[in-house]
Amino acid sequence: MNLEEKPTMTASRASPQAEHLYYVRCSICNTILAVGIPLKRMLDTVTVKCGHCGNLSFLTTTPPLQGHVSLTLQMQSFGGSDYKKGSSSSSSSSTSSDQPPSPSPPFVVKPPEKKQRLPSAYNRFMRDEIQRIKSANPEIPHREAFSAAAKNWAKYIPNSPTSITSGGHNMIHGLGFGEKK
């Protein structure tokens, strides 16, 4: 279990050591939980609820011994500790007791990335039609080109052999006001 201590200052208190901020990994979902404990509560057992999975854990802090810089923390999970992923009962003989295990980087749960959707048939048609109208008449304002493209869309039936196409021979030319070439 990775535990990290970081003293912080809250906005409501003036002393720089008003509370300690601890980073604790949830034993169920491995989410890093930031727990701020006021100094007056340092000897109490604090209940921590994971915001991701709802697991309740109890965080117990002990005061530092003389010569010790960091606090020792004990975290007991309230149910579900038997369901840890990758837990094993055997200890590794290759690790030496002189060297503490290297801390792994914190595990951060990120929201899933939004998938880029393909443009609709209307959006593709309008983009191509405005581009075609502006290439035929570069001085036309975008507003008029959009209006002409919208009128052409009203006459366009997708996936129809007789519909107008951006490169076809049935295209309404010019500004698209119903004039056929």
Swiss-Prot record:
| Any one of the GO CC terms | nucleus
Keywords recorded for this protein, A-Z: Developmental protein, Differentiation, DNA-binding, Flowering, Metal-binding, Nucleus, Transcription, Transcription regulation, Zinc, Zinc-finger
Function of this protein? Transcription factor required for the initiation of nectary development. Also involved in suppressing early radial growth of the gynoecium, in promoting its later elongation and in fusion of its carpels by regulating both cell division and expansion. Establishes the polar differentiation in the carpels by specifying abaxial cell fate in the ovary wall. Regulates both cell division and expansion.
Gene3D superfamilies, per database record: High mobility group box domain
User: In terms of one coarse class, where is the protein primarily found?
Assistant: nucleus
Found, by tissue, as follows: Restricted to flowers, mostly in carpels and nectaries. Expressed at low levels in sepal primordia (buds), sepal receptacle and developing petal. Not detected in placental tissues, septum, stigma and ovules.
Task: Give compartment(s).
Answer: Nucleus
- Write out the ranges of the annotated region (Disordered): 80-122
Q: Which GO terms describe its biological process?
A: carpel development; cell differentiation; floral meristem determinacy; nectary development; polarity specification of adaxial/abaxial axis; regulation of DNA-templated transcription; style development
This entry's comment on induction and repression of expression is: Down-regulated by SPT and by A class genes AP2 and LUG in the outer whorl. In the third whorl, B class genes AP3 and PI, and the C class gene AG act redundantly with each other and in combination with SEP1, SEP2, SEP3, SHP1 and SHP2 to activate CRC in nectaries and carpels. LFY enhances its expression.
Skewed-composition ranges (Pro residues): 100-109
The effect of disrupting this gene, in the record's words, is: The double mutants crc-1 rbl-1, crc-1 sqn-4, and crc-1 ult1-4 exhibit strong floral meristem (FM) indeterminacy with reiterations of extra floral whorls in the center of the flower.
For this chain, the family text in UniProt reads: Belongs to the YABBY family.
Q: Name one Pfam family in it.
A: YABBY
Locate the compositionally biased regions of type Low complexity. 87-99
Protein name according to UniProt: Protein CRABS CLAW
PANTHER family in the cross-refs: PROTEIN CRABS CLAW (PTHR31675:SF1), PROTEIN YABBY 6-RELATED (PTHR31675)
Q: Which InterPro entries match?
A: HMG_box_dom_sf, YABBY, YABBY_C, YABBY_N
A GO molecular function term, named singly, is: sequence-specific DNA binding
State the species of origin: Arabidopsis thaliana
Q: Where do the ZnF regions (C4-type) fall? A: 26-53
